[in-house]
């Protein structure tokens, strides 16, 4: 049976959208939900947090989830410091139990929903009889394409099989970057006609504010990231020490984490508010993100929104966001010598910093705003719902 026309015909009861999420997703869930509401103003959007609404309210489900996670990933939890919260979403138990609970909860009201929509590909929120859409920044197997990614850090094939079900049950999949779209096709066999790259926007207020960086002469570098190792923090410290040998007044500000043993010229502030991130960006001369794994990198979009140049790794989504030699510099991951040279090239050239920052700002204003993302998602949903399922 084909899906209903979009928008619903007069008299149709399909006037709701179910929006499924897991936690905050670095504030992306808030921005995405705002766009779903803005782009579908005639629809009531019901938000549903699978963790808070399904797991935390059911002590037995939570206890069994922990037990299954420890049984499946016990050694990795202990030796690789794999976070329990991350591993629990990669167990067959929680995957199937969440899908059962979602279907049971919504079964009596299936007729009320025009479509369902989920962010991230960690669970399957599809409901039989309702068109389903996914918006994600990653696939798990995309990790295997990063240089030097340890094979023993990949989740087992049992999880990949479940992840593949998420994509099979979606009418259309929206992704933040082309490298994820490529992975969907090459690693999961998803036809390109069922995927769209829609990018993402900034998760902090980007209202224009004057920069306080002495015309890019204060030589302040900002790093933003919660996962110090994954974001290339140790490589950045090694590069920064090399940089300081030539540029002794260079300064490194670390936001999001608080590593120990920092050399002179470095300061770490740990987790800070979005407003504090904005203030630090306004005081910086550039952003550096020498990440080892990067599904998207919203921090780069936020830096460009503040007219800052960037130095980032040439992996994942980065080459699609940063134009080499125009808005920033791309370097290989885990290469402190190349990173130090790139930092030196920009931090000692205020005019180039300003020129790159303006180019990055123009690029994100055109392609990386939440309004642009919402418009692309709406267009994709409209086109999909006008096409019979399976056509």
Predicted regions and their residues:
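Carbohydrate-associated surface elements
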Residues: 179, 201
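Short alpha-helical donor nucleotide-sugar binding micro-motif in glycosyltransferases
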Residues: 272, 279-284
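A short hydrophobic beta-strand element within the catalytic core of glycosyltransferases
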Residues: 287-288
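Membrane-proximal helix-turn-helix segments that form the acceptor-binding/catalytic region
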Residues: 152-173
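Short hydrophobic beta-strand element within catalytic cores of glycosyltransferases
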Residues: 309-312, 322
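Aromatic "clamp/platform" in nucleotide-sugar-dependent glycosyltransferases that forms part
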Residues: 292
